Amino acid sequence: MKYTNIREGQFLSRPNRFIAKVEIDGKEEICHVKNTGRCRELLIPGVTVFLQEADFEHRKTKYDLIGVRKGNRLINMDSQVPNKVFREWLEKGYFQELQHIKQEQTFRNSRFDFYLEAGQRKIFVEVKGVTLEEEGVALFPDAPTERGVKHLRELSQAVAAGYEAYVVFIIQMKDIHYFTPNIKTHQAFGDSLIQAEKQGVKILALDCEVTEDSIEAGDFVTVKLVEG
């Protein structure tokens, strides 16, 4: 996926989860943050950030904050990107005989990100974007997510009903050793992920090639459900 009109700036502060103050070419600007998560380990005053200049004149903010440099690692933090990255990756042929892709498909009380048909296979997929990294380990979630727990339970129900089910973690950066659930932040999500795998839900993690103006799915990353 490619972006246009990218500008580099320095992060100053985040008054609330929707906006941030940044400096671009010596001028302070208010920008929209395309991730309502906490991102405290990323948005540190003075770090280099990447912003997309909006095409629409009537917006309240002129820029969208989409990426940040953390040490030598460039991290895309746009929460709208993972589904787009996954779809592009799908279309390169992971599922043989893929003939149908539908986004936002309802199953019982949940709406999953994707429903796929590949030959005789009927598949539900839930996609999660990952921006939290500690010492080369990718972690999800960065805040408690009861919605995430609900999705895992209902993916298990889909398996019991005869479907295939996947949860796919799109790690929005490169150079990751492995992925593991963030049990320090939300033990219930980690427990639910382990239980979902036991019940037949498949778990995939993919890292991404990230530049200032692009992001693309890269390689599979090892998933560790019990750290160590």
From Swiss-Prot:
For this chain, one GO molecular function annotation is: DNA binding
List the CDD domains hit by this protein, alphabetically.
Answer: SfsA-like_bacterial (cd22359)
**Stored Pfam families:** SfsA (PF03749), SfsA_N (PF17746)
- Highest taxon above the source species: Bacteria
Q: Which family does it belong to?
A: Belongs to the SfsA family.
Can you name this protein? Sugar fermentation stimulation protein homolog
Q: Organism, per UniProt?
A: Desulfitobacterium hafniense (strain DSM 10664 / DCB-2)
Taxonomically, what lineage is the organism? Bacteria, Bacillati, Bacillota, Clostridia, Eubacteriales
